[in-house]
């Protein structure tokens, strides 16, 4: 049997390579690297099935389906998104549903995918993420203790640095796409291993990345996920793992003593998912498909279908990119409108406060001045009243003396 490994050549996130690395150990060999965003146009060298472990985010572009007839899929740790991309929301799931039903049940990476497939009555279960199956690496222990920060905000990183004597190492999952594409997959997986060694030797890892936090659980490294307080999409992704991860919203994290965070120990509740994933994959990855006679001729399929589909995909990609540019422009304009609206409201509120403070100030000044004037008038009245009475008394005395 031939085996294919899912890869994403154009990724800008090493998390995709980490998922491919995690799947690699379950394959007896790698005969083909199967590009995640071109599953529909994959063609092997010969007329044969290629067993593929379908872990990762599929149909990101939402038009690359059905998958190639040569792919014999085992869906586990699978993510599908219903978020609107290029104007498409769930239409691709409706069209892709017969294929998914044929190869179900689908092992979903998260509750979002599980609920989406339930909506279209596609048999599925929550399998968890394949990165939980990563094995510890053989690497010397670090001579010094350190905290590793992975794609956290500047505020979080500075808070850690200012409140600990431990060394702080900063890492990112962001990649330079052009530079990464120049590397072979073996070189990319070596980069993954080197990054995982840093995580494995850390005293504590603090991250916003799910594909950093889950491998850290598998490696036995204490890890804390710092969540985005406002992102609905982010919360949808992590909700499936909150029971086995320690997590803080950023505001709460910045209030927590670092000494308390350094006492953190991981929960063991992830082990059930890890063990289940390993068993399911081992039980299914070598299951053969003896129906190869029904496959199309490779040369015919390549000439008639693939070349035509590639042209259609290029057209769709152009349309999608044009839509995305317009969408991004509109989104940026909306952000600007929201920004100025918020600033206007804040300025208006500040102005009202300033006017109120100003009013109160001048009202007090006026009242104080009025009171001072009234007191001056009264004092003046009292003075002249006394002067008058004294004068009157003197007049009376003079008048009486005259008589």
Label for each model-derived stretch:
Residues 402-403:
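Short acidic DE-rich linear segments
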Residues 344, 348-351, 355-362, 366-384, ...:
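Residues forming the hydrophobic interface stripe of long heptad-repeat coiled-coil alpha-helices
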């Amino acid at each position: 049997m031939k085996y294919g490994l899912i890869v994403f050549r154009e990724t800008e996130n090493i998390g995709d390579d980490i998922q491919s690395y995690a799947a690699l150990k379950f394959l007896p060999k790698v005969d083909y690297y199967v590009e995640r965003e071109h599953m529909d146009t994959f063609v092997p060298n010969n007329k044969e099935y290629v067993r593929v472990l379908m872990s990762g985010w599929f149909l990101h572009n939402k038009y690359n389906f059905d998958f190639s007839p040569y792919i014999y899929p085992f869906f586990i740790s699978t993510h599908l998104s219903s978020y609107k991309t290029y104007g498409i929301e769930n239409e691709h799931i409706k069209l892709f549903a017969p294929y998914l039903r044929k190869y179900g049940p689908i092992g979903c990476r998260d509750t979002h995918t599980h609920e989406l497939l339930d909506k279209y009555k596609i048999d599925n279960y929550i399998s968890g993420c394949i990165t939980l199956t990563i094995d510890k690496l053989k690497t010397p222990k670090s001579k010094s203790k350190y905290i590793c920060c992975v794609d956290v905000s500047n505020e979080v990183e500075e808070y850690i640095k200012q409140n600990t004597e431990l060394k702080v190492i900063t890492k990112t999952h962001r990649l330079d796409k052009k530079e990464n594409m120049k590397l072979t997959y073996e070189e990319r997986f070596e980069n993954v291993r080197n990054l995982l060694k840093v995580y494995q030797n850390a005293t504590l890892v603090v991250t916003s990345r799910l594909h950093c936090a889950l491998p850290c659980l598998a490696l036995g490294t204490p890890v804390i996920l710092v969540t985005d307080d406002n992102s609905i999409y982010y919360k949808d992704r992590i909700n499936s793992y909150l029971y086995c991860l320690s997590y803080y919203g950023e505001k709460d994290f910045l209030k927590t003593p670092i000494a308390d965070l350094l006492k953190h120990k991981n929960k063991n509740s992830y082990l059930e998912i890890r063990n289940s994933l390993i068993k399911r994959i081992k039980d299914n990855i070598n299951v053969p498909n003896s129906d190869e006679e029904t496959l199309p001729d490779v040369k015919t399929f390549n000439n008639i279908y693939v070349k035509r589909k590639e042209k259609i995909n290029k057209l769709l990609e152009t349309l999608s990119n044009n839509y995305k540019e317009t969408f991004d422009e509109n989104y940026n304009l909306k952000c600007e409108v929201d920004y100025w609206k918020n600033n206007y409201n804040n300025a208006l509120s500040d102005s009202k406060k300033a006017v109120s403070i100003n009013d109160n100030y001048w009202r007090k000044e006026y009242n104080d001045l009025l009171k001072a004037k009234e007191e001056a008038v009264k004092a003046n009245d009292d003075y002249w009243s006394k002067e008058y009475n004294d004068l009157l008394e003197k007049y009376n005395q003079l008048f009486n003396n005259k008589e």
